[in-house]
Amino acid sequence: MIEIESRELADIPVLHAYPVGQKDTPLPCVIFYHGFTSSSLVYSYFAVALAQAGLRVIMPDAPDHGSRFSGDAARRLNQFWQILLQSMQEFTTLRAAIAEENWLLDDRLAVGGASMGAMTALGITARHPTVRCTASMMGSGYFTSLARSLFPPLIPETAAQQNEFNNIVAPLAEWEATNHLEQLSDRPLLLWHGLDDDVVPADESLRLQQALSETGRDKLLTCSWQPGVRHRITPEALDAAVTFFRQHL
């Protein structure tokens, strides 16, 4: 059995799940990030499944999502990449808050996520060596190129607009896989993707697999590709994530 609560950590609304009676017991912990226009509540089945596996789970609401949503859905659609960047930046204070609660067992902290949340997890892993392992479900580590086709912040039609676009996208380069293959390969990494994904193409995960493989950095890499699956989490994907974290965290 498990327990689950809504609360704030570092002023960030989160879902917090853990095995029953172990709220204050140090445990291996997974920070799991949800997808765009969704919320931690919608993705709470990950919290349930991982807590049932004996892990502590923290699921933050992304900026302008869940209980942080401003109510302006049209504006949010143009803020995907800014939201992603802020989510990655918030990891440092979120991790510190978890440690302050004395919730971590032997610093065993992992990250994972789905869609935008998977991008968040990959970016965090690229910059934070304390992350023990990472699960990316239908994500991408190639932010600056994907920003031209997936929820672009604007369609540049003038030199000024191109400059604005570049200013939004440029900070993402510090977090993306292109510049951090070594950091993404020195601990266990799971890539799961539906091969018929119609939002974040499976080629995004396949590209990362190829980059790691071609440079001999795939020894800790686990890949799971599901034919016929579009942009959604399947029972098989959930099982793959739970199995991965149980094995490596």
Swiss-Prot record:
Alphabetized PANTHER family for the sequence: DIENELACTONE HYDROLASE DOMAIN-CONTAINING PROTEIN-RELATED (PTHR22946), POLYKETIDE TRANSFERASE AF380 (PTHR22946:SF9)
Organism encoding this protein: Escherichia coli (strain K12)
Record flagged with keyword Acetylation: no
Nucleotide-binding recorded as keyword: no
Biological function: Displays esterase activity toward palmitoyl-CoA and pNP-butyrate.
Enzyme class: hydrolase
Coiled coil (residue ranges): none
InterPro entries named in the record: AB_hydrolase_fold, FrsA_esterase, Peptidase_S9_cat
Gene that specifies this protein: yjfP
NCBIfam families: PRK10566.1 (NF007857)
Pfam family, one: Peptidase_S9
Key words, A-Z: Hydrolase
Protein name, as recorded: Esterase YjfP
Biological process, per Gene Ontology: proteolysis
Any one GO molecular function term: hydrolase activity
EC number annotated for this UniProt entry: 3.1.-.-
